[in-house]
């Protein structure tokens, strides 16, 4: 596995020795919350908070890749976020394109798979083009899969899956009996996340303690970890703290031990 080169800002942060590398979560999901609060505390425009959030994403992707996380899913823009001021939405869309252009070479060099999930066709054309380009160019990589949840909503995802099942029935690709006997795993294959394993832990910074329509089907047995730190300030050390907490939990999946 190729390692990212940490910037001077990130060197020395976190303590790898505190992590049990035999029990690294396979799939980490993060609700990247608190960009606006971060900017407000500094009397900056909200767009500056979103830009700083991109820097946080960059360092967390690096660290997840380095320590052996297989899947990282980040909630970047929800189906409900369209109600925000138009200028903020437009700025977020520009930042998505800029992030992909700026970071693509390093991500690709380090074997990262870029996988957008959500109603991607509902995004502006420039975003669609940038996302599809990054996806196609990294699809044969074998390292960390970075799932970018954009124009994503858990309810929308489940409803879309049901529609896709019905469409498959109409096209004689699946029978009525097969629909009635669908397993959890088979239904999951119709979701935006496809056959990606469910998240082991969902992290939410900013102090909020709710799912906000994120991975509603997939989070059935996920562990949750909350922090009062706003996303732009989320550090490698904070990631390690969340992982160590996860490693100390007793996951029973409905059973007993």
UniProtKB/Swiss-Prot annotation:
Task: Say which family it is in.
Answer: Belongs to the UPP synthase family.
Q: Does the keyword Transcription apply?
A: no
- What protein does this entry describe? Isoprenyl transferase
State the free-text cofactor note.
Binds 2 magnesium ions per subunit.
EC nos:
2.5.1.-
Chain's role: Catalyzes the condensation of isopentenyl diphosphate (IPP) with allylic pyrophosphates generating different type of terpenoids.
Q: Which GO terms describe its molecular function?
A: ditrans,polycis-undecaprenyl-diphosphate synthase [(2E,6E)-farnesyl-diphosphate specific] activity; magnesium ion binding; manganese ion binding
Q: Which CDD domains match?
A: Cis_IPPS
Quaternary data: Homodimer.
> Where does the chain bind substrate?
34-38, 46, 50, 78-80, 82, 84, 204, 210-212
Question: Where are the catalytic residues?
Answer: 33, 81
From which domain of life does this come? Bacteria
The record's PROSITE patterns line, in alphabetical order, gives: UPP_SYNTHASE
Which EC class is the enzyme in? transferase
Q: Which cofactor does it need?
A: Mg(2+)
**PANTHER family in the record:** DEHYDRODOLICHYL DIPHOSPHATE SYNTHASE 2, DEHYDRODOLICHYL DIPHOSPHATE SYNTHASE FAMILY MEMBER
Q: Name one Pfam family in it.
A: Prenyltransf
Q: Which UniProt keywords apply?
A: Magnesium, Metal-binding, Transferase
Name the GO cellular-component terms. Answer: cytosol
Q: Which organism is it from?
A: Clostridium acetobutylicum (strain ATCC 824 / DSM 792 / JCM 1419 / IAM 19013 / LMG 5710 / NBRC 13948 / NRRL B-527 / VKM B-1787 / 2291 / W)
Cited SUPFAM superfamilies:
Undecaprenyl diphosphate synthase
What residues bind Mg(2+), as annotated? 33, 223
GO biological process entries: polyprenol biosynthetic process
């Amino acid at each position: 596995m190729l390692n990212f080169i940490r910037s001077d800002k990130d060197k020395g942060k976190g303590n790898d020795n505190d992590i049990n590398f035999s029990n690294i979560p396979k799939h980490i999901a993060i609700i990247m919350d608190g960009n606006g609060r971060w900017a407000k505390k500094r009397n900056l425009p909200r767009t500056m908070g979103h830009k700083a959030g991109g820097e946080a994403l960059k360092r967390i992707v690096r660290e997840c890749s380095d320590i052996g996380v297989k899947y990282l899913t980040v909630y970047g823009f929800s189906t409900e976020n369209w109600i925000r001021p138009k200028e903020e939405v437009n700025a977020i869309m520009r930042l998505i394109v800029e992030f992909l252009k700026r970071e693509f070479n390093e991500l690709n060099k380090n074997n990262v798979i870029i996988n957008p999930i959500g109603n991607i066709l509902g995004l502006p054309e420039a975003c669609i083009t940038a996302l599809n380009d990054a996806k196609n160019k990294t699809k044969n990589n074998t390292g960390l899969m970075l799932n970018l949840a954009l124009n994503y909503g858990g309810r929308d995802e489940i409803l879309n899956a049901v529609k896709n099942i019905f469409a498959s029935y109409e096209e004689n690709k699946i029978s009525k009996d097969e629909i009635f006997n669908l397993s959890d795993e088979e239904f999951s294959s119709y979701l935006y996340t496809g056959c990606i394993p469910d998240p082991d832990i969902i992290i939410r910074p900013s102090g909020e303690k709710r799912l906000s329509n994120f991975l509603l089907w997939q989070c059935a047995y996920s562990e949750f970890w909350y922090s009062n730190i706003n996303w732009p300030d989320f550090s490698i050390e904070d990631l390690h703290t969340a992982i160590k907490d996860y490693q100390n939990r007793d996951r029973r999946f409905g059973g007993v031990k």
